[in-house]
């Protein structure tokens, strides 16, 4: 059967495998591509190709990530798998590979392990909306009661981290047996069941263009006789000529009207998510708006200075700091287009943070920035990236 081209008409969903080392994340990733390739819904990617994932740079941080793609009858999936535990942490915190849903892989022979917990917690902190669980290596456990026990324990663990433990789908199987016998109905059944569950349980993401308008301001010009133009890339939503926009962050929020949208020196009726535009703003002076602010649909985003965040601090070998930092550390936080100084408060019982650690912190900025939970940032010292983070909660 000839391999058909992927249908780009299907809804696109980003997923990824998470879980403890050696529980079978990469084997499962390979098995999905192998089993689906029997129906032309994927091209098979070998375990070793996934395992020696290429390195990518995201926000100044090097991360090894493997990408595969496949499709079901209903959807097109992009799937990420990381070779090392540190890569997972970096990936989830930087959002290098945004996940609309996760496949948590747990070996039935071991049950929940430290990295299982850490990945579930991180998924919660960085806002992964849903996950399904693949109980792997079930062929190596003779006692069904033992498998049930592992499942019960995991459902409780999911509850602890505010995932709906009772509702999360669990699929029992063996990724290795499916990988080796993709045509065998019994052995490959767990993969087809997994596909059905991610299709039905992981919600379809809201497309950027359907979300409320937001554009980080990158530059500001005044055009004599016409007014002030703010330029930037529309992050989400649509801005139409004549609509009201708010200028948010750094100083008091101001409302104005967008009287024109241009792109590549042409006038348009609207700017959409992904477009690099100039927005002409009525009655706004050149000095009233600056880089670091955002244009947004009024009432959809507010400026804040205090937040909780999950951070990864670069190791020395990654070009990060050579020494630990302590409570009261004052780096710059790079949000969207600009650096803002902030003060870091470490959690109780943590004296210092070593290069290469990940840590949950509280931070207070010296100027307010438009933000909501899920916003990512780089941590910098004098223009050099020393870490990355994602806001888990707004405090004030």
Swiss-Prot record:
Q: Output the Pfam families linked to this UniProt entry.
A: GTP_EFTU (PF00009), GTP_EFTU_D2 (PF03144), GTP_EFTU_D3 (PF03143)
What Enzyme Commission number(s) appear in the record? 3.6.5.3
Which keywords are on file for this protein?
Cytoplasm, Elongation factor, GTP-binding, Hydrolase, Magnesium, Metal-binding, Nucleotide-binding, Protein biosynthesis
Q: Which GO terms describe its cellular component?
A: cytosol
Segments for region (G2): 60-64
The record's region (G4) falls at: 136-139
- Ranges for domain tr-type G: 10-206
Where is this protein found? Cytoplasm
This one is known as: Elongation factor Tu 1
Organism whose genome encodes this protein: Desulfotalea psychrophila (strain LSv54 / DSM 12343)
Tell me the organism's taxonomic lineage.
Bacteria, Pseudomonadati, Thermodesulfobacteriota, Desulfobulbia, Desulfobulbales
